[in-house]
């Protein structure tokens, strides 16, 4: 299939590489052009603009936030004028996803397909893809999704449903990290090591991947290089808050999580992993 890919950060580069590996014809674009070089060396075409990348069957965007997606779609040389079905893998607001769906409706079509998984999952094609949009559009994209991931979840025909699932999932991940970090701080202050607590928890009732993956990160203080940077986590929690406000859903845990993300960014800088909230929690308890 002829595919355009826009957004070549660590996640996007890995996803695009897997599309190449699966034999798809790929054009790539990134705001910093040098990010495209490794993929071009492997056979991708370096598109001259987002719209150039969108001269394809499908154009995928994997960008940091709403403003980056808006620039790629609506800016000069944006993809809205292209012929490709637009698939957004970005974690964006529900409101922007609704706007994109409306604006693409009379053109090529739009699918929201955010992913769950850290960079190593992207590199090994083990992502989980959450897709929403017209069934025929998702059918077209499913071979592409399976080149990058291990499972596709279809969550409805309204594209923003996938973004709501992704934001809800990210809130649950961050809440699990918050709870583990608080529990580890309590245990450690009472003389029980973090590793010991984690072994008990994951060996009994908390064996899910989120506890195993982030528990190890918290035990080892493995916060750099960031698999998912704290400012992006804070951005996502702000999007959760916007969705909760729009739906009048109280989410008190969200406020705690956001405060700890703000604290660790202020204390450690923007290159810290979002699991670095554990540092802010320890400092609050006088152990950091």
Annotate the PLM regions.
Residues 23, 43, 107-108, 191, ...:
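Glycine-centered short loops/turns at secondary-structure junctions
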Residues 26, 46, 110-111, 152, ...:
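Hydrophobic beta-strand scaffold residues
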Residues 50-108:
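Rossmann-fold NAD(P) dinucleotide-binding segment
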Residues 91-170:
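Rossmann-fold dinucleotide-binding core
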Residues 161-285:
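Helical "substrate-binding/catalytic lid" subdomain
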């Amino acid at each position: 299939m002829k595919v355009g890919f826009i957004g070549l950060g660590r996640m996007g580069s890995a996803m695009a590489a897997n599309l190449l590996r699966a034999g798809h014809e790929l054009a790539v674009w990134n705001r910093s052009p040098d990010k495209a070089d490794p993929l071009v060396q492997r056979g991708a075409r370096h598109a001259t603009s987002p719209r150039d990348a969108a001269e394809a069957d499908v154009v995928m965007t994997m960008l940091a936030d709403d403003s980056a997606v808006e620039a790629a779609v609506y800016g000069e040389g944006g993809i809205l004028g292209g012929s490709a079905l637009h698939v957004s893998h970005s974690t964006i607001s529900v409101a922007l996803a609704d706007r994109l769906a409306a604006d693409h409706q009379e053109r090529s079509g739009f699918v929201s397909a955010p992913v769950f998984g850290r960079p190593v999952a992207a590199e090994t094609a083990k992502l989980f893809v959450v897709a929403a949009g017209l069934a025929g559009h998702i059918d077209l994209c499913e071979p592409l999704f399976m080149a990058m991931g291990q499972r596709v979840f279809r969550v409805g025909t309204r594209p923003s449903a996938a973004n709501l699932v992704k934001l809800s999932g990210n809130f649950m991940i961050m809440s699990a990290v918050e709870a583990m970090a608080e529990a580890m701080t309590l245990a450690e202050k009472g003389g029980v090591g973090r590793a010991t607590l984690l072994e008990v928890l994951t060996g009994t009732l908390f064996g899910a991947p989120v506890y195993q993956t982030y528990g190890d990160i918290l035990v080892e203080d493995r916060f750099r290089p960031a698999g998912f940077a704290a400012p992006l986590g804070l951005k996502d929690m702000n999007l959760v808050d916007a969705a909760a406000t729009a739906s009048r859903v109280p989410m008190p845990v969200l406020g705690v999580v956001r405060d700890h993300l703000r604290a660790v960014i202020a204390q450690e800088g923007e290159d810290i992993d979002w699991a670095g909230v554990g540092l802010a929690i320890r400092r609050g308890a006088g152990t950091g």
